[in-house]
A protein has these predicted regions:
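Bacterial N-terminal signal peptides
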Residues: 9-22
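Second-shell loop/turn segments in exported
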Residues: 128-129, 138-147
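Short, well-structured alpha-helical segments that form the helix of a local strand-helix-strand
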Residues: 153-162, 300-307
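Accessory, solvent-exposed terminal regions and/or long lumenal/extracellular loops of proteins
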Residues: 264-325, 329-334, 431, 438
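Substrate-recognition/cap regions that form aromatic- and gly/pro-loop-enriched pockets
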Residues: 317-447
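Histidine-centered catalytic/metal-binding microenvironments
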Residues: 421-490
Length: 490
């Protein structure tokens, strides 16, 4: 197994040397990663959801808070390909991580604690059935606007895919609320499957379907399109006479993607952080595992920063000392544009219980900043352009001399990462010192700040929101100061 993986790594390094002659490079390392911690596997007692959004540059990420909205009768929603559906009377408030120009890269958390993100999981479907052009970009937005629970979100996704068909090559949507986590696997066209993550377990996905065994009689934990097995038989992807049980991932995933070590190695590395040595490195990995210890937000952050350090797969560039672009994708890599950990807690007002720990640029060399749902808006500078940048503009922004500019959050963090990545081996230690200090303070202040906000909330919600916003803004400004210190140090 390791010999085959290392052979691929060497091939990747050689390939990168060829394609690196022009800028930007081919997206070596391009691929998302997601985690769901079941409520009984978390320290909080509620679901934690996390995601690294990996897309090769040029990109920009905006963060916005969108208010609850009332809609007039007879209003319609138009889908990207031209399909239409009736608008609902009320759409819920949500936090929106937006990547302009990208159809499948946005993520959301709404006012009920329903969180949705996705991983590309290419399928072998090449004859998708679509109505009115199908649905793609708007699926996650509609879930955020309309669902009050994760199960409602899955049900809505099912209705949309059954009606329009899914207009993409395969994807896993991660849909969670404080009590449940689901993987909704859209194959393409009108075939899909969804599986619930066990409450006491942790599941990860890294760009390939992870649902294997399917219990069609268990509609509490599995939902599928009616002909999910029969369709596979009709396409000669599954033979029931073989004696082998129906394995969704084996049947529907693109075989090359499923056997790609850059995908299953990332899945394994995520699971090893959770379950330790009980999960051996293999192409065949469990859907979910029982953790050695219950996880909190800080433990999940550690997983999102993983680069195989401490394993035989860990490699670094001889030029920069970075684990990036060494031939095998890492969970945190140079294409990670934004990352988040969502604490989805009940037992208190959701304005306080929902916490969005977000990071701009690759988290292995960046900072997580907490934002409670109750904030009225993100700090100035967290949303700027509504368009995807050009190659030249992106290069100009990240290669310019570093300036800690609070009015341009994405460009400040991206520029910082560019400077660190060029001399990663010599600079990462000082980055980690600053990151640890700021994040430890953020976690230490978390509970006392929430206690103050809770006292205020029943009498003055605006004052409670200001308390939460001041906490977040203070952490944000401290990250800007830290980046300036790191790059100003001799």
């Amino acid at each position: 197994m390791l010999k085959r993986i290392f052979a691929r790594m060497l091939l990747g390094v050689f390939a990168f040397g060829i394609i690196a002659l022009s800028w930007p490079t081919v997206a070596l390392g391009d691929g998302c990663f997601s985690i769901v911690v079941g409520k009984d596997a978390s320290v909080d007692g509620y679901v934690i959801m996390a995601h690294n959004e990996d897309d090769a540059p040029p990109q920009i990420v905006n963060h916005r808070k969108v208010s609850r909205m009332q809609h007039p009768p007879h209003e319609t929603v138009e889908l990207l390909a031209g399909g239409e559906l009736d608008q609902v009377e009320v759409t819920w408030a949500y936090i929106w991580s937006e990547m302009p120009g990208m159809l499948f890269s946005d993520s959301y958390i709404n006012e009920w604690g329903v969180c949705i993100a996705s991983d590309a999981c290419p399928s072998r479907e090449d004859q998708p059935e679509l109505t009115d052009g199908g649905i793609s970009y708007m699926l996650r937005r509609l879930v955020a606007e309309r669902a009050k629970t994760a199960r409602e979100g899955v049900t809505l996704a099912v209705e949309l895919v059954d009606r329009f068909g899914y207009d993409a090559f395969g994807r896993t949507y991660i849909i969670c609320d404080p009590d449940e986590g689901w993987f909704f696997c859209a194959v393409g066209g009108k075939h899909w499957l969804s599986r619930r993550i066990p409450d006491n377990e942790v599941a990860v996905v890294a760009n390939s379907f992870t649902v294997h065994e399917v219990d069609l009689s268990d509609q509490t934990n599995f939902l599928t399109s009616e002909d999910i097995v029969d369709y596979a038989i009709s396409r000669s992807w599954y033979d029931p006479e073989s004696g082998s049980p129906f394995d969704f991932a084996a049947v529907y995933a693109d075989p090359e993607v499923a056997s790609d070590s850059s995908n299953y190695c990332r899945q394994w590395s995520g699971l090893r952080h959770v379950a330790g040595d009980s999960v051996p490195l293999s192409e065949s990995l469990p859907f979910s595992v029982v953790p050695k210890n219950k996880l909190d937000a800080a433990a999940v952050v550690k997983i999102l920063r993983d680069d195989y350090e401490g394993t035989e797969l860990y490699q670094t560039s001889p030029e920069t000392g970075s684990p990036d672009k060494t031939g095998l994708n890492t969970i945190c890599n140079w294409t990670t544009q934004t990352s988040f950990v969502a604490q989805l807690r009940r037992g208190m007002p959701l304005d306080i219980g929902i916490v969005y720990w977000m990071c701009l640029s690759p988290p292995c060399a960046s900072f997580y900043i907490p934002f409670h749902f109750g904030i009225s808006t993100f700090p100035t500078g967290f949303a700027s352009s509504g368009e995807q940048p050009s190659d030249d503009f992106y290069k100009e922004k990240v290669e310019a001399p570093f300036r800690a500019d609070p009015s341009e959050a994405f460009w400040t963090f991206s520029n910082f990462y560019h400077k660190i990545a060029s001399d990663y081996g010599n600079k990462i230690a000082s980055v980690r010192v600053e990151v640890d200090g700021i994040e430890q303070r953020a976690f230490a202040l978390h509970k006392p700040v929430e206690e103050v906000a809770l006292e205020l909330y029943s009498v003055d919600k605006a004052a409670a929101a200001d308390t939460l916003a001041n906490y977040s803004n203070g952490i944000y400004l401290s990250t800007l100061e830290a980046m300036a210190r790191i790059l100003g140090a001799k």
